[in-house]
């Protein structure tokens, strides 16, 4: 069967997953394995866990920290929004994240975005330079657009299969996907989907008090698994 260019691009996601599984096996050859993936990383840990479970490994915890399962992660409402309104929305979001965090969370927030600020400045400079170079060099611009489209395919075109185990989703209840109860994961055939709401924006899941609450909840799942294993041993 002849493979299309899109198939080759899509396979890159699968190759990355295989590489991660190989690295995991080098460190820990056998399960049980506990997984937590944040945002876009959730798609990777889901597929890693699914393939490991398929090969017979035990996955007692597969948790997704406000990860999405959509054909496109961008919200059309936000994309079509006027630029000024979009920027004002971002400012409002970050102010809300800062205010709703506790003291420790605010300190962590400032530390994170202090380093993020310099990263973003460097990134914006590179984007600005690429745009200038694209206008001066048509061939370069065409190649850049080709790479952009290929990366988009990598992110959005890999088809995830169902998973027979339990998926734990920590769902941010503020922001553009607030009304989407399961972030699209209910569109897959899962053994069980457990959704825990977090009273924060997507960007707030990495700061206190959300972090402690997520940690405590995950600990409950781990303790439950350990107790079940002890019960099996006694039998």
What feature does the model see in each segment?
Residues 1-235:
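A hydrolase-biased, glycine/serine/histidine/acidic-enriched motif that marks catalytic-domain neighborhoods
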């Amino acid at each position: 069967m002849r493979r299309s260019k899109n198939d080759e691009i899509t396979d890159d996601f699968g190759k990355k997953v295989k590489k991660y599984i190989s690295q995991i096996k080098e460190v820990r050859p056998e399960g049980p394995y506990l997984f937590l993936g944040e945002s876009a990383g959730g798609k990777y840990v889901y597929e890693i866990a699914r393939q490991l479970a398929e090969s017979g490994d035990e996955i007692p915890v597969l948790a997704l920290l406000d990860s999405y399962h959509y054909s496109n992660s961008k919200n059309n409402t936000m994309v079509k929004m006027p630029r000024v309104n979009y920027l004002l929305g971002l400012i409002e979001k970050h102010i809300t994240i800062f205010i709703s965090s506790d003291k420790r969370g605010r300190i962590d927030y400032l530390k994170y975005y202090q380093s993020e600020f310099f990263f973003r400045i460097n990134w914006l400079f590179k984007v600005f330079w690429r745009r200038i170079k694209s206008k001066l060099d048509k061939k370069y611009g065409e190649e850049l657009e080709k790479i952009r489209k290929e990366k988009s395919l990598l992110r959005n075109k890999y088809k995830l299969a169902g998973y027979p185990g339990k998926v734990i989703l920590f769902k941010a209840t503020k922001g553009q996907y607030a009304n989407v109860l399961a972030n699209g994961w209910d569109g897959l055939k899962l053994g069980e989907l457990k959704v825990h709401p977090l009273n924060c924006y997507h960007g707030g899941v990495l700061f206190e008090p959300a972090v402690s609450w997520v940690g405590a909840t995950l600990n409950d799942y781990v303790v439950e698994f350990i107790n079940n294993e002890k019960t099996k041993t006694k039998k």
